[in-house]
């Protein structure tokens, strides 16, 4: 089935991509899960634990554990909401922002090197991105309807 091959094609690139990205993250003493959450905070700050767990489709306890490590490493700060004391806003510290910028550059170099070895056009990449965003939105809706 074409749909099965479609999904499998994305799953098969995930592990090899992680293997290439891990040395970059190890160089900066950060794990892949921490990087994904740090990147999420950088893109959506100020944000909350609930928003991160929704966008990343991860359980709140998993996100909480990862956030604790990022806080302990002085990469993010937590501020209480003035309206709701239970709500806490997460932002990058200057150290976290610096790490985000450095890792982004290193990861972009890796990604550009991989793309350069293919014959993928900018239009093909954009179309793939659009399709993946559509699928991601549907999957998130399905996951939150359970």
Feature locations, PLM:
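N-terminal leader segment of winged-helix/HTH proteins
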Residues: 1-28, 75, 126, 134-135
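Short, locally clustered residues in the helix-turn-helix/winged-helix DNA-binding domain
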Residues: 11, 39-43, 104
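A structural signal for well-ordered alpha-helices, especially hydrophobic packing surfaces
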Residues: 14, 100, 136-140
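N-terminal helix-turn-helix DNA-binding core of bacterial DNA-binding proteins
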Residues: 19-61
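Charged, amphipathic alpha-helical coiled-coil/dimerization segments
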Residues: 69-130
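Exposed, interaction-prone assembly regions rather than primary DNA-binding/catalytic cores
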Residues: 122-146
């Amino acid at each position: 089935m074409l749909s099965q091959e479609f999904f499998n094609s994305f799953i098969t690139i995930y592990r090899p991509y992680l293997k290439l990205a891990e040395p970059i993250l190890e160089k900066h003493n950060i794990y892949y899960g921490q990087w994904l959450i740090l990147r999420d905070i950088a893109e959506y700050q100020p944000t909350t634990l609930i928003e991160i767990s929704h966008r990343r489709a991860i359980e709140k306890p998993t996100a909480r554990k990862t956030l604790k490590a990022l806080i302990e490493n002085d990469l993010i700060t937590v501020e209480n909401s003035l309206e709701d004391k239970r709500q806490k806003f997460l932002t990058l510290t200057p150290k976290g922002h610096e790490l985000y910028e450095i890792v982004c550059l290193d990861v972009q170099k890796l990604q550009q090197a991989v793309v350069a070895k293919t014959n993928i056009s900018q239009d093909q990449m954009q179309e793939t991105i659009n399709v993946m965003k559509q699928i991601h939105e549907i999957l998130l809706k399905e996951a939150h309807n359970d």
